[in-house]
């Protein structure tokens, strides 16, 4: 995660520096943002942490501000030094993760830290129809977050 940092790359000038992040916002036909890239990353992380790390959704949400702080301090300042920036967002990502993510978010107690922030995100999910994860290719990057892929982690 921190391999773009000068303290690492300056001693390895031959290294190819790659920055990967789900960065795209989803826009409506008028160009208005209907689902932010940061929400997509929160959704990915919440689903993955719940399914594969045994972490409750409210715990992921409670740590989200610290995760974002770490991104801003240790990753974002160096992303422009990458030889290649890759946006790992998928146009169909929200519909595939929608059912699992909204189930986790809706089950959170209202006294969860940052719950009010989550309430501003939940209506955005309603704009998307669910797409069955069964339709995803077994080698899809999204399988990292929902499982059922052909790779072992």
For every predicted segment, state its role:
Residues 1-153:
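Conserved NTP phosphate-binding and transfer environment spanning the P-loop NTPase/kinase superfamily
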């Amino acid at each position: 995660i921190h391999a773009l940092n000068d303290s690492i790359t300056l001693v390895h000038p031959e290294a190819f520096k790659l920055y990967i992040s789900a960065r795209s916002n989803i826009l409506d036909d008028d160009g208005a943002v209907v689902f932010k890239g940061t929400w997509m990353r929160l959704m990915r992380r919440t689903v993955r942490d719940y399914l594969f790390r045994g972490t409750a959704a409210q715990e992921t949400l409670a740590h989200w501000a610290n995760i974002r702080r770490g991104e801003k301090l240790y990753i974002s300042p160096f992303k422009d030094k990458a030889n290649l920036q890759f946006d790992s967002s998928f146009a169909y990502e929200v519909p595939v993760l929608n059912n699992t993510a909204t189930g986790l978010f809706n089950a959170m107690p209202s006294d969860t830290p940052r719950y009010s922030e989550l309430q501003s995100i939940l209506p955005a999910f309603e704009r998307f129809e669910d797409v069955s994860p069964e339709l995803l290719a077994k080698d899809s990057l999204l399988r990292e977050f929902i499982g059922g892929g052909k790779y072992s982690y």
